[in-house]
UniProtKB/Swiss-Prot annotation:
<dbReference type="InterPro" id="IPR029063">
    <property type="entry name" value="SAM-dependent_MTases_sf"/>
</dbReference>
<comment type="similarity">
    <text>Belongs to the class I-like SAM-binding methyltransferase superfamily. CmoB family.</text>
</comment>
<feature type="binding site">
    <location>
        <position position="197"/>
    </location>
    <ligand>
        <name>carboxy-S-adenosyl-L-methionine</name>
    </ligand>
</feature>
<feature type="binding site">
    <location>
        <begin position="182"/>
        <end position="183"/>
    </location>
    <ligand>
        <name>carboxy-S-adenosyl-L-methionine</name>
    </ligand>
</feature>
<keyword id="KW-0808">Transferase</keyword>
<comment type="function">
    <text>Catalyzes carboxymethyl transfer from carboxy-S-adenosyl-L-methionine (Cx-SAM) to 5-hydroxyuridine (ho5U) to form 5-carboxymethoxyuridine (cmo5U) at position 34 in tRNAs.</text>
</comment>
<feature type="binding site">
    <location>
        <position position="111"/>
    </location>
    <ligand>
        <name>carboxy-S-adenosyl-L-methionine</name>
    </ligand>
</feature>
<comment type="subunit">
    <text>Homotetramer.</text>
</comment>
<feature type="binding site">
    <location>
        <position position="201"/>
    </location>
    <ligand>
        <name>carboxy-S-adenosyl-L-methionine</name>
    </ligand>
</feature>
<feature type="binding site">
    <location>
        <position position="316"/>
    </location>
    <ligand>
        <name>carboxy-S-adenosyl-L-methionine</name>
    </ligand>
</feature>
<dbReference type="GO" id="GO:0002098">
    <property type="term" value="P:tRNA wobble uridine modification"/>
</dbReference>
<feature type="binding site">
    <location>
        <position position="106"/>
    </location>
    <ligand>
        <name>carboxy-S-adenosyl-L-methionine</name>
    </ligand>
</feature>
<keyword id="KW-0819">tRNA processing</keyword>
<dbReference type="InterPro" id="IPR027555">
    <property type="entry name" value="Mo5U34_MeTrfas-like"/>
</dbReference>
<feature type="binding site">
    <location>
        <position position="131"/>
    </location>
    <ligand>
        <name>carboxy-S-adenosyl-L-methionine</name>
    </ligand>
</feature>
<feature type="binding site">
    <location>
        <position position="92"/>
    </location>
    <ligand>
        <name>carboxy-S-adenosyl-L-methionine</name>
    </ligand>
</feature>
<dbReference type="Pfam" id="PF08003">
    <property type="entry name" value="Methyltransf_9"/>
</dbReference>
Length: 324
């Protein structure tokens, strides 16, 4: 598959090379399956229709911004913008690409700002982001100095959004999304840092997820875990009966104390809570790039401390831990 040709070259002669035994057939099967969907075919055509641009200015450290001198023509800019809008909704961002500002639903830079002070240095490191959505944070990881940033994300639209951005930032940049689930990827125990952000509460078995993350880390590697939490002691967890904030696939929202117990149960050490933040409408909101319901629609209109179902409104915790 041409979408992964660079990636296959990157993982030769390093611990990830064992993936070459399984990934090519897995990704070929994924492509054949996903392109049976007319929407996915349209997304692929949209990405293929984008020009390959090499920016003369690229900032991945403070934001994701690409520009070129002299600037692209107004007609080319409009054509790119129309193609990017054909990949809506954009839930993660923002991106500034040749004068086009993708104002995504989530201001993912806010999360990155909270996480960054607590990271081990990423300079020259190999990092994995599990459930990476459209790869926004992969680019920020490269900006922080990572040598290789790999994301795992099974949702097709997110993959095509990533490929669109990659085409506009530069194909040689060492970031890649694998459109698979983490349980379908062989453990390599080789990543310096593994991220799981906004995933744990979607998993029916949170302990299995933590073990999957651990099995990708090298010894002494850092785990960064960001997830929904509730107040309570080390025995308290919220299991929504039907929906949480209009999401059907939320299974498990633990207290911070219980999350700490889980991490230690799975063998992680030096577990630290580094941030707890209430999700705000400044960070998650409806925009012209994501026009359907957003956080404000998920909260009780009379009491924003509760979801529409009456549960505690979203609070997100960030914990770090290490594999022995």
């Amino acid at each position: 598959m041409t979408e992964f040709s660079h990636f296959y070259q990157w993982i030769v002669n390093n611990p990830f090379e064992i993936w070459l035994n399984t990934l090519p057939s897995q990704l070929t099967a994924w492509r054949l399956s996903v392109l049976k969907n007319p929407k996915a075919k349209a997304w692929l055509n949209t990405v293929q229709g984008l020009p390959e641009l090499l920016p003369s200015y690229l900032n991945l450290l403070d934001r994701i911004q690409a520009d070129i001198s002299p600037p692209i023509s107004e007609s080319l800019q409009k054509g790119i913008e129309n193609r990017l809008k054909a990949l809506m909704p954009w839930r993660k961002g923002p991106f500034s690409l040749y004068g086009i500002h993708i104002d995504s639903e989530w201001r993912s830079n806010c999360k990155w700002k909270r996480i960054l002070p607590h990271l081990d240095s990423l300079v020259g490191k190999k990092v994995l982001d599990v459930g990476c959505a459209n790869g926004y944070h992969l680019w920020r990881m490269l900006g922080a100095g990572a040598r290789l940033a790999i994301g795992v994300e099974p949702m097709p639209l997110f993959f095509f959004q990533f490929m669109a951005v990659k085409k506009l930032l530069g194909e040689a940049l060492k970031a890649q999304i694998l459109p698979l689930r983490i349980e379908n990827i062989a453990p390599v125990e080789a990543f310096d840092t593994v991220f799981s952000m906004g995933v744990l509460y979607h998993r029916r078995s949170p302990l299995d997820h933590l073990y999957q993350l651990k099995n990708q880390l090298r010894s002494s590697g850092q785990l960064v875990l960001e997830t929904l939490v509730i107040d309570g002691n080390d025995q308290q967890v919220l299991i929504p009966e039907k929906e949480y904030a209009k999401m059907r696939n939320v299974y498990f929202i633990p207290s911070v104390s219980l999350l700490n117990v889980f991490l230690k149960k799975c063998g992680f050490i030096d577990v630290r809570l580094v941030d707890v933040t209430a999700t705000s409408t400044d960070e998650q909101r409806r925009t012209c790039w994501m026009t359907s319901e957003s956080l404000l629609d998920f909260l009780d209109p009379e009491d924003h401390s509760k979801t529409i179902e009456g549960y505690p409104a979203p609070f997100r915790a960030i914990l770090t831990a290490y594999k022995p």
